[in-house]
Amino acid sequence: MRIFKSHRLLKLVNSYIIDSPQPTNLSYLWNFGSLLALCLGIQIVTGVTLAMHYSPSITDALYSIEHIMRDVNNGWLIRYLHANTASAFFFLVYLHMGRGIYYGSYQGSRSLTWNIGVVIFIVMIVTAFLGYVLPFGQMSLWGATVITNLLSAIPWINQDLVEFIWGGFSVNNATLNRFFSLHYLLPFILAALVLMHLIALHDTVGSSNPLGISGNYDRLPFAPYFLFKDLVTIFLFMLGLSIFVLFMPNALGDCENYVMANPMQTPAAIVPEWYLLPFYAILRSIPDKTLGVVAMLGAILILMALPYLDKSNIRGMQFKPLSKIAFYIFIANFLVLMILGAKHVEDPFIIFGQISTTLYFSYFIIITPLFSIFDNILFDIATKKK
């Protein structure tokens, strides 16, 4: 083990993975980081392998996917692993962010770590959208057309910007080549951002803990205690992922994407992947195109404002009954938005979408600041009595 503490590169591995001191009371909710790192590794390895056989052409893209599935050794396994790990990646990210909001992991000196995490989330969304277009089935073509057309809401440069991204007057070969290049590049940028996320976490105050207090008084090294704990959830995760990949690989996909792209025929409903549905529902809930785009972007970017909106002296919601209720309502509302994102734009879904969008923004803009002020008042009263 001496080389781990003397070698220039291995010393970093030692400080982050082996000797890194962690609070002793960390629960399994702090295991998402290792699972997300595993997902990113799987995505990069399977993605690079798929890229060796993929053809970014509007005429050959779908055929190259079928070639991978039928002719490449274990190509079906690599493709389904890539597709289902993407869903698992977002599922774990949502759990990771939800845990961060519940336990106040964005407060104080951890705000930089939180904001880098939000940037990672944005890059993930862009990467997922680009990957969704690559098979170039019906949903790929029309999804690319609809989402890129949102840029026409930008004043002055609207349609010119859209055509610049397309490389023509509609989605074509140039578009697919650009999307493929960016989809290949962004995971490596994502890996760099993950390293920045880790550096920001470990070079400040380290991991938070379920009690929301300083963990400096009682810590244990990461290995072997938390390393073994991470391995438990990694094995369980691989078991769950294997069930999806081997027994129901298309459960989270869209059958329309197995149909050759046809610019003359619009699908009955144009919907993104399930993990982007809440933001798609926010976009569609506002009739005005420009305001809808602003609301959709605001729904993501408002997460960056959370460290400045929550000024409570008590970190987390463990001992705040009202905040707990508000948080669970927020989670339920987020799931409702996910359901509404897959529905047709018609009554009563339009009204429900507008109500859910209002509740989503109200949680951050109204409820969180008010509850933090209320908590601080109660905290001051309690301390003065003592």
Curated annotation (Swiss-Prot):
Alphabetized UniProt keyword annotations: Electron transport, Heme, Iron, Membrane, Metal-binding, Mitochondrion, Mitochondrion inner membrane, Respiratory chain, Transmembrane, Transmembrane helix, Transport, Ubiquinone
Main location group: mitochondrion
Molecular function terms from GO: metal ion binding; ubiquinol-cytochrome-c reductase activity
Residues reported to bind heme b b562: H82, H183
GO cellular component terms attached to this protein's record: mitochondrial inner membrane; respiratory chain complex III
Xref: InterPro entries: Cyt_b/b6_C, Cyt_b/b6_C_sf, Cyt_b/b6_N, Cytb/b6-like_sf, Cytochrome_b, Cytochrome_b_C_euk/bac, Cytochrome_b_N_euk/bac, Di-haem_cyt_TM
Free-text remark on how the cofactor is bound: Binds 2 heme b groups non-covalently.
UniProt keyword Cell cycle present: no
Sequence positions that bind heme b b566: H96, H197
Cofactor(s) the protein requires to work: heme b
Positions contributing to a ubiquinone binding: H202
Cellular compartment(s): Mitochondrion inner membrane
Transmembrane domains' residue ranges: 32-52, 76-98, 113-133, 179-199, 226-246, 290-310, 322-342, 349-369
Membrane topology: Multi-pass membrane protein
GO biological process per UniProt: mitochondrial electron transport, ubiquinol to cytochrome c
Pfam families according to UniProt: Cytochrom_B_C (PF00032), Cytochrome_B (PF00033)
Stated family: Belongs to the cytochrome b family.
Protein's job: Component of the ubiquinol-cytochrome c reductase complex (complex III or cytochrome b-c1 complex) that is part of the mitochondrial respiratory chain. The b-c1 complex mediates electron transfer from ubiquinol to cytochrome c. Contributes to the generation of a proton gradient across the mitochondrial membrane that is then used for ATP synthesis.
UniProt miscellaneous comment: Heme 1 (or BL or b562) is low-potential and absorbs at about 562 nm, and heme 2 (or BH or b566) is high-potential and absorbs at about 566 nm.
Assembly with partners or alone: Fungal cytochrome b-c1 complex contains 10 subunits; 3 respiratory subunits, 2 core proteins and 5 low-molecular weight proteins. Cytochrome b-c1 complex is a homodimer.
Protein's UniProt name: Cytochrome b
Taxonomic source organism: Trichophyton rubrum
Gene designation: COB
